[in-house]
Structures are given as structure tokens and as C-alpha cells.
Amino acid sequence: MRSLFRALVLAGPLIAAAPLAAQDDTTFSAEDVFALEYADDPRISPDGRTVLFVRRSNDIMSDRTEGAIWMVPVVGGEPRLVVDGASQAEWSPDGRRIVYSGRDSNDRAAIYTRWMDSGQVQQVASLDSGASSLAWSPDGQWIAFTSNVDAERKPLAKMPKKPEGAKWSDAVKVIDHAQFRRDGRGFLDPAFRHVFVVPANGGTPRKLTQGDFDHDGPLSWSRDGRSIYFSANRNEGWELQTVESDIYTVDVGSGALSQFTSGSGVEGNPQVSPDGGRVAFVCMPNVKRPVWQIDVCVKNADGSGARNLTQSLDREVGDIRWGGNRAIYFTFDDRGEKKIGRVSLDGRVT
């Protein structure tokens, strides 16, 4: 697990800051934000030798955070640029390719793969909305992802035909959902997040989930490649249930859904064990208390034996990863420091 520790350390501090203009006042100013850069989203190669990460920078011209995929040896060395203007890199199971999200020549959201030996890049698909939660199938033949699909909305009234050359005001915005605005984004376009699959060699994405619900990643494939785990709140009153989600599986062939968890509260971030026998996930019971805490839970792949493994730990769990088939590593904050913990399947935390 030494590679995991190195990758997590890599993601923490700022990796670079562009030189600031010489000035007498060294107080951090608003403009200095555009000089900051940091490393994010590390991914270790299957052979444990290389770490991919996203180098984030803030563009003063567009007022946006931009991403570029870089790589660095696990043992240390000089980072090298892999792809500019891209993010969400994921290694293929054999380590020969990576998949990532970016923009195509028409500035549309797109998914690409890159052969790491030759540098050859192939566009897998163009999308109307951005792709998230990219995940390779175990055999490397498919890529799963989530993407927003515009919701169908009936107009409030039938508008008259607009004369040629007329300059009308924007159409009235009809809001009929409780969750219509978010901090940092403003008003939300009516859309729902769905799970898709696309051939890794390119093709037409196929939508697996249906209904007016958000289906969230990260995504995790079953070891036989027949189904995909994800989280969602598919209850009728989901918009008013802010602390509720369950884990589902969707059959890749038929699109049939099966509910894997049904506890009260949040259950998400499913991670299938290497042998496929268990599924780890984060859980947070919806109970009436002043403070909620996210824990590590595990359940057998057949749906039996659900357990909370970190209930005795007075810390909130962050990201989780399997360490073999008998333990789960997780991140947590402790008095201002980011730490890594390990919990065995019998609940021993170290």
C-alpha cells in the first residue's frame, strides 16, 4: 500500500505557484488566486509504478479552473505532461491505456482514450453534457460513465410564432422542482444524471438508467462485467429527502435495476472487492442527532451480511479503497490533518 500513501500525499499540497510580480505588499490578494496551482485526483497504475494526477490552474482570462493530466513515477521524479485541457483520468485494467474527459474540436464534451506506450489518442464519444465517474469494465472492453440528460418539460403556454427578425425577450423560466438552484451554479437547467456505457474503442453511448432521478457515481463494475453499482435516491419524494440515497445495480445487457441497499440515510460510493464477493460503501444513518458521521460499511455481493465497520471510530470517513479482499483503507481528518486508516472486515481499525 506504499503507492497509495504516496499518491495521497501528492494530492494534498500545492505543487506550484506562478511567480508573483515583485511588490512591497505581501498580503494575499484576490488576484493571487490565479497564480495558484495544485495536484488533484491521483490514480496509480496497475503495476504500481506511475501516478496520474490532474494539475489544476486558474485562468484569469476565462475565470475558470482548468485541468491537465500529468504523470510522475511513484518513487519520485520529474512530472511529465500527458494531456492538456483534460481531467478524470482512469487506467485501463491492463495499464496500457487511460480514459479521460475533455473537449472536442467543436468544444463539445468528449471522452478519449490514450495508449500510454505510443501516445495515440482516440475519441470514444462526443456528448451533449459532460461525462463524470469514468469506469473501465474488468475486461477493458467498455467504459461506463454518468452524464446529464435534459428533462422533458411542457411549456407554460403556447407562444405565438416569432416574426422573422424580431427581437423578443427570453422566454419565461418555469420552475416546477424543489431543487432548482445551487450555490456557485445559480439556476439549474432541468436535467437528470444517468448511467451510460460506450465501447472502449469508440461508438454510440447507451443509456442504462431511466426515470426522473439522479444516478450518481462513482461507478463500480461487478467482477463478471455484467452489472454496475451506483447510488441514487429513486423515492417518489426524493427532492425533499436531502439525507437519503441507496445503492443500486444496473444490468449492462438489459438495463434492469436491482436495489442493493435500503437503509435509512445515505449509502454511496460503492467499491466492489477484488474477488467480487463483497461491496464496500460509505454510510450515514438518517437519525435525529446534532451531528452526522460518515462510516465505512460492507455487504456481501449477494445482499447479505451488511455491517458498519467504523462505528467505533469518532471520525468521519472520506474516500475508501479495498486493500486486498480482507481490509479497506480510508481517509479521515484528525485535528486538522489528513490521515489514512485501515479497517479489517471484523471491524478492527488501525
Where are these predicted regions, by residue range?
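Bacterial N-terminal signal peptides
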Residues: 7-17
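Sec/Tat signal peptide C-region and signal peptidase I cleavage site
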Residues: 18-22
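A short helix->beta-strand "capping" segment at the edge of beta-propeller domains
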Residues: 23-37, 205-208
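Beta-strand-rich domains and repeat architectures in extracellular enzymes and scaffolds
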Residues: 31-67
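Residue-level recognition of a conserved intra-blade site in WD40 beta-propeller repeats
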Residues: 44, 91, 136, 221, ...
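Hydrophobic beta-strand positions that form the internal "hydrophobic ladder"
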Residues: 48-51, 95-99, 140-143, 225-229, ...
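A flexible loop/linker signature enriched in serine peptidases of the S9 family
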Residues: 55-68, 81-88, 101-112, 120, ...
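Short loop/turn segments that connect beta-strands within beta-propeller blades
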Residues: 73-77, 115-119, 199-203, 251-255, ...
